[in-house]
């Protein structure tokens, strides 16, 4: 796409130059550059947004309750996305948090939580703690949210390790941490 844009730009410039239209050349160059910038930006951020399942949506009142209780009421959509990723809202541990430190009622083995509401409470408490450790300032603080989400997945130790060693989340340092 970029090669075709460059070629078209060269052709337009030569046509405009032959007619002596300096202003026309500038206008054409600006238009082409704007178009090219939009195309390149859309290629880099081409992510499909999928809605959450009906199972996740059914938990929304419970999610709102515990999000408020744990001090993150503005993060309901993020919590729903975590649940969607972890379980699609299905099963007895929809937040997949049986192994986290906030689980005090069930064994710390995968799938041991048998109460969905308890899973949501524990998962939101864990996510709130991860967001706090990652120094997340708002639901728009994507760098801190990425760090917090990786900490939710790997354990909170990842967050402090990544912050101390690299100052941020990267895919490469997440892989490095997982190999330790």
Give the role of each language-model region.
Residues 29-33, 82, 152:
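Residue-level preference for non-acidic, small/hydrophobic
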């Amino acid at each position: 796409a970029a090669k075709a844009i460059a070629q078209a730009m060269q052709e337009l410039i030569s046509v405009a130059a032959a007619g002596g239209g300096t202003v026309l050349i500038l206008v054409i160059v600006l238009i082409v550059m704007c178009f090219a910038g939009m195309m390149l930006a859309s290629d880099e951020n081409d992510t499909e947004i999928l809605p959450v399942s009906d199972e996740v949506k059914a938990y929304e009142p419970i999610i709102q309750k515990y999000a408020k209780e744990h001090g993150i009421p503005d993060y309901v959509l993020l919590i729903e996305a975590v649940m969607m990723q972890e379980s699609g809202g299905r099963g007895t541990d929809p937040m997949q948090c049986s192994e986290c430190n906030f689980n005090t009622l069930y064994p710390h083995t995968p799938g041991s939580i048998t109460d969905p509401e308890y899973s949501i409470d524990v998962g939101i408490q864990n996510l709130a703690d991860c967001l706090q450790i990652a120094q997340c300032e708002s639901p728009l603080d994507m760098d801190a949210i990425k760090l917090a989400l990786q900490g939710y997945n790997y354990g909170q130790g990842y967050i402090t390790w990544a912050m101390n060693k690299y100052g941020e989340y990267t895919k490469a340092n997440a892989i490095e941490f997982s190999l330790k």
